[in-house]
Amino acid sequence: MTEREVGRKIGVKELSPIDVYKLLPRTNCKECGEENCMAFATKVVNREVPIEKCKPLLTKEYEKAYKQLKEMLKPAIKEVVVGTGDKAVKIGGKLVMYRHEFTYFNPTAIAIDLTDEMPDEALAERINKAAQFHYEYIGMDLHLDMFAVRSTSGDPEKFKATIEKVMDKTSFPLVLCSFDPKVMEAGLTVAGNTRPLIYAANKDNWREMAELALKYKCPLAVFAPNDIKLLKSLVKTLLEYGVEDLVLDPGTFPTDGLADTLNNFTMIRRAACKYGDELLGFPLIGVPMTVWLEGEGLPEEVLKWRETYLAGMLIVRFADLLILHTADWWALLPNVILRQNIYTDPRKPVAVEPGLRTFGNPDENSPVMFTTNFALTYYTVASDIESGKIDCYLLVVDTEGIAVDSAVAGRKLTAEKVAEALKESGIEQKVKHRKLIIPGKAARLSGEIEELTGWQVLVGPRDSSGIPKFIQEKWSPT
């Protein structure tokens, strides 16, 4: 018996454009911007457009079909929004357990912790340090996402005052951390309208925390350390109570319980994605900073290292939100790069727009080079050109986001494509010479390019780090 026959919701791998098309108005009205309803259905299945772009579907006539489609397209992991406005962070929203099955959405959010017992100067310094963390990686700005304000004092007024200070200094979304409902309510009186994540409800305080979540319309974390059965029970109770936006914390144990931590995260995500367990179909929160609670007596650098590798483990073990204590660049950078790589869409390579780029102040005698539009290749070449302070033109050829050697082998980079790109770029009107420097890994195309373009081809270095030396030794416009 198939999964459809037993009544399970259609999975993303089983869902076809026909399934969606059958429930659309099928009028080909083009209000969605597509030529016909089938084209729109295809984009909906690929999650390229929301179903709400079909305006007729939102009318009373198609209300039943709209509800069916929303249920059909509902992700296995509910998407929860923390914060408001431009800085709002979406967590969850996963359709599959493993990225290669489709793709991942909403990269793991990273929050840095603050406490209500920090001196004002230290608080401001820590906020600025985290907020200023930025790193450009293949054209993307990698940064942190949130702050987690912890009540270590247990004093409602202190907690409230600290949150006010934090909100004065940053617009990042907040996680408010306390198991005491009175402390939490004090914080929510200040931050409630910014939709913070309430951390957390447990078996002792769930009712009070649920009331606060409903009152302030905020998402709520559910905490049941190393007890999935209790976690499900709490989720069921909270859903029945009316709280819909939940985030699950099954506990993070950095030492003896590390295996349990990874197993729990995996079992929860598997239950939701593979077996349709809706009680576990919520974002997961990991707290690598627990290493600081269990590491008394150990050197600070050792604890930072432990927290860093634990964060990396949880990123690849389905965590949708992490709370960290370490804010050092060396500890954060590996994980934001790991996160970016994990959340890259495997269905399409990371690419840049093809076309002509200028570096420095090139003139009619400046070198002309070309590379592919694979993002990693382009930004590596661009970085080496800039560091070498070279005034030149760089032609970016469309290879569908594939690197030079692979593009040549797969016929995505051909002499014909280079000739076409040269013609379309208008470079012939910008320089007097007719010399083109090509990547060393595209050397086999040199003869064909010369025949098709009439340009003299210079075979450049195999690695872009050699460009400055190559220009210095080999380049002459005459």
What do the PLM-derived regions correspond to, one by one?
Residues V6-G7, L23-P25, C218-P219:
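Short beta-alpha connecting loops at secondary-structure transitions
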Residues E3-S16, T42-M72:
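Non-heme iron-sulfur electron-transfer modules
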Residues P25-K43, E52-P56:
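Local cysteine-cluster metal-coordination motifs and their immediate loop/turn environment
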Residues E3, N46, A109-L239, E244-K441, ...:
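Conserved mixed alpha/beta catalytic, RNA-binding, or beta-rich assembly cores of soluble enzyme
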Residues G11-R26, Y62-I127, P354-N361, T478:
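N-terminal amphipathic alpha-helix/helix-capping segment at the start of soluble metabolic enzymes
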Residues M1-R8, C29, L279:
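A broadly conserved sequence feature marking short terminus-proximal activation segments
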